[in-house]
Amino acid sequence: MSKKNARWRKLDNAAKLYSAASNKKDTRVFRFYCELKEEVDSDVLQEALNQTIETFPTFLMVLRKGLFWHYLEPCNLRPIVKEEYKEPCSRLYIRDKKTLLFEVTYYKKRINFEVFHVLTDGTGATEFLKELIKNYLYLAHKEEGLEQVALLPEDMTVQDQEDDSFLKYYSKDQKRPKKRKLNTFQIRRKKKDGNHLHVHESVVSVQAVLKRSRELGVSMTIFLTALFMMAINEEMSKMQKKKPVVLMVPVNLRKFFPSTSMLNFFNWIEPGYNFTTQDQSFEAVLKYTKEFFETELTKEKMSAHISELLALELHPILRLAPLELKNLCIQAGAKYSEKNTTAIFSNMSAVKMPESYVPYIERFGVYTNTPKLELCLCSFQDKLSFAFTSRYDTVNIERNFYRLLKEQGITSEKVKPEFPKAGKPSELEMKVYKIYSFLCIAIVAAMLVTDLNFHPRIRWTLFTAGGVVTMWIASSIGFFKRYNLLKNAFRPMVSTSISGSSFRAL
């Protein structure tokens, strides 16, 4: 592969939306991981990552703010392998902070690759992780005779990797008929645990799903899309069923337009079904879904959608709008578009590795941070990994989904969640901290009011207020580092008491 240093570059169409719409809760980060059959060696993984970055220099970028758009700039930062230490799919991009937009971590037998969607899409992430796993296994087992193999074309260049395929296939003349957006059913459940992301995974047999799909005369994606809509329908009341269930289903555009780009290059379709006005049987939902996919998944319609998205971005007046104004408009548009879909279903398809590397790998998996309920899946060999992610206090829909699968003759096996304890305070700890903060503010306010009204000769009120503020700041810093309020409040309280005693002695 030709290795020419990457240069600064413009964001692709999807990346421009992600850079503006991401926030602390909706991080636009997704995780692709590989579970091995052996414990991960961090030193070997670091060496493998260093080699992988040589293959994909386009990933060594930081996000910068320009006058009109964000852009990516090469940097001298290098990724450091860490043991997993935080909630999956946590924020990677922090505004005005120079950080890489991806991270490689490990936990026991699992290697995680997390990436901000600005940098790449699912296909790009798959290629990066495959290269990383290949390099790791080669370094770990080359003494056993494992051979080094190339996964990418030898003649692939950096320019190929950073090619903006959206622009490449944009046509001014291509137009898509406008569709009226539906007022869709929205899942509304009380969120728990401080709005943390919840991940629930299961594994099924690829052959079992393919066998049943073929018996029904549909693809695996169509079969599972219909089941997902049925599972959601079972949780809807009679009133709620007046609104359609609409899924967002991402589509890899490389299947329609040749591209070796590592940038975002995907589209989506939105199959929707109204369970009040349409037949509620599975056969009817499956028939509708099949017809919808056949109608929408055409090169002409994908091309028209690309042109529609690019036409807005390239509008001469909108291009001149300052970045901050664009960000506000994109954020408002993203918030509005959330109402157009009920949930998200993303099929990352099969991950293939060289035959000699297969015995060392258990499975691959993928999931993403999302404000909605999302089902992601990918397969390796005969293991199809499902991952439901949400921030809702319910697992009923996924329970329904797996029950419906079982009714189709497909059994699933739950994956026991294995995550290190997240470095975040619990809901109870946050409540205690908020009460503590309120009391500190109340004391400071009382001291200031007392000082203003009584004007004591010795300004003990101001010293007390200052001591409380100091104690609160020190306690807060310690709390968000260690999440133990009593332990972190003790030292400031002692310091404040000593200071107060010294002052009185004077």
Where are these regions (language model features)?
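Juxtamembrane interface helix immediately N-terminal to a transmembrane segment
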Residues: 424-440
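Juxtamembrane "helix-exit" motif on the non-cytosolic side of transmembrane helices
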Residues: 447-456
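Low-acidity, Ser/Thr- and Arg-rich intrinsically disordered low-complexity segments
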Residues: 482, 487-504
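Hydrophobic alpha-helical transmembrane segments
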Residues: 456-467
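Acyl-thioester-dependent acyl-group transfer interface
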Residues: 1-67, 76-103, 234-423
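Acyl activation and transfer enzymes in specialized metabolism, enriched
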Residues: 37-54, 114-130, 199-238, 386-388, ...
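Canonical alpha-helical transmembrane segments of integral membrane proteins
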Residues: 435-448, 467-468
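Non-catalytic, low-complexity flexible loops and terminal extensions
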Residues: 2-13, 110, 119-127, 131-211, ...
